[in-house]
Amino acid sequence: MTSTVTQQAANALPPVARTYQVRTYGCQMNVHDSERLAGLLEDAGYRRAADGADADVVVFNTCAVRENADNKLYGNLSHLAPRKRSEPQMQIAVGGCLAQKDRDAVLRRAPWVDVVFGTHNIGSLPTLLERARHNRAAQVEIAEALQEFPSTLPAARESAYAGWVSISVGCNNTCTFCIVPSLRGKEVDRRPGDVLAEIQTLVDQGVLEVTLLGQNVNAYGVSFAADERLREDPRMWQSVPRNRGAFAELLRACGRIDGLERVRFTSPHPAEFTDDVIEAMAETPNVCPALHMPLQSGSDRILRAMRRSYRAEKYLGIIDRVRAAIPDAAITTDLIVGFPGETEEDFQATLDVVAASRFSSAFTFQYSKRPGTPAADMPGQLPKAVVSERYQRLIELQERISLEENQAQVGRTLELLVATGEGRKDAATARLSGRARDGRLVHFAPGAAADEPLARRAFDQVRPGDVVTTTVTGAAPHHLIADGALLTHRRTRAGDAHAAGLRPRTGVGLGIPGVGAPAPAPVTTGCAL
């Protein structure tokens, strides 16, 4: 009798789902791809591991742009090796650009890895994990071209209030320092209706802000994933008609979505930046007054060697036209120091363009030699000491400009979308963080808004996803400070969702079996039967 009851209890217990963790390296594209990986795994029955807990499946979504990305990945894989030996049932998967580049080399350097999948194989991850577990052998799947636009895949979004929306994947440019086109393939664009439908789905779940993603958003319209010629052969991109006004039209269409309060995009290419985009930014109220436009170098000679297809004069002209149309626009950029053959004169040209551009901030990088790129074989590779010294001078100039630009914000009233986990805050002041419409990070005092009656102030605690207005009281190079009382506080559905721990979901399921929940294991009771 006891044995029968015990067995019935064991059978009644639900199976324990396997847990997962996704570790992301690199750009916003990878961050969004990781949301898709999470969505796929959850649709297949896995559940996210608790913070600090060891996951049954660890997925690395990798970057191949810089050398330290390689070192970071293989270092982390080495740290997991002892656990893999002691817990052979746990699984390790490596995906993303580095997996696409290194392929079988991942298994040679880390033979304890279970799955290696490429940038075009995101949707295969749950199946590959199950196959590796069943066959007890590593699985490698690297496709050479995009077969299905990844935004059709389910995605478990990280934020309740802001979402990434891909408008294209791949790149048709041939920058000599960049390995991305060889890993992500030629550009393939989504149809506007598909993009807008995904945005609407996010807004319906309370999302207030979207960022449109593409390697070169200005080239949007060069091809469309739904074009029949691309379905037959993805290499046919050159023969697909292009709508050069498609991106500006897409921005304006975003302006017609009720409830969508903020639209951002990244990254445009200066060579294809057209005035219709500037006009759309200026005339569409929910398009944020912010522009991130990579410069890379201020030297025309180096830009030519980089194959960047524009020169410093054109770049500065775009900035002038943006600021004429949108006076309060915050402009940010990417810069590379120490490209092969860069002379002191070339570097000074970069400093001159940076000084003239008055960037709000800049992502600055020391040139990193990447095997497989034309720049890796160029003569004139610079000594590390020279690159480091120039890098420091560039940092000092941009830090001064960033501080001056932020100091000019003191006294202004800004609308903030309250965020979570943004930057360093002073715990003693209990500040929260938010992003202004121009993208600046603001640490603010979360005191009750002046327009709120006392009876509501306890209820109206500020939450990530809410919208507040406040006055800037201080500045640093990388953030603003607002220590006065809030002027207004608007509770939002995004704030409700964040407080409830809800995450937006997009994409469609693929009919993947629920492999994350294995058959129930035998239960040992207190009677040890």
UniProtKB/Swiss-Prot annotation:
Enzyme superclass (EC): transferase
CDD domains membership: Radical_SAM
Annotated catalysed reactions: N(6)-dimethylallyladenosine(37) in tRNA + (sulfur carrier)-SH + AH2 + 2 S-adenosyl-L-methionine = 2-methylsulfanyl-N(6)-dimethylallyladenosine(37) in tRNA + (sulfur carrier)-H + 5'-deoxyadenosine + L-methionine + A + S-adenosyl-L-homocysteine + 2 H(+)
Domain of life (superkingdom): Bacteria
Domain Radical SAM core residues, every copy: 157-404
PROSITE patterns membership: MTTASE_N, MTTASE_RADICAL, RADICAL_SAM, TRAM
A Gene Ontology term for the protein's cellular component: cytosol
Cofactor: [4Fe-4S] cluster
Entry similarity comment: Belongs to the methylthiotransferase family. MiaB subfamily.
Function in brief: Catalyzes the methylthiolation of N6-(dimethylallyl)adenosine (i(6)A), leading to the formation of 2-methylthio-N6-(dimethylallyl)adenosine (ms(2)i(6)A) at position 37 in tRNAs that read codons beginning with uridine.
Subunit and partners: Monomer.
Listed name of the protein: tRNA-2-methylthio-N(6)-dimethylallyladenosine synthase
Organism annotation: Mycobacterium sp. (strain KMS)
Species classification: Bacteria, Bacillati, Actinomycetota, Actinomycetes, Mycobacteriales
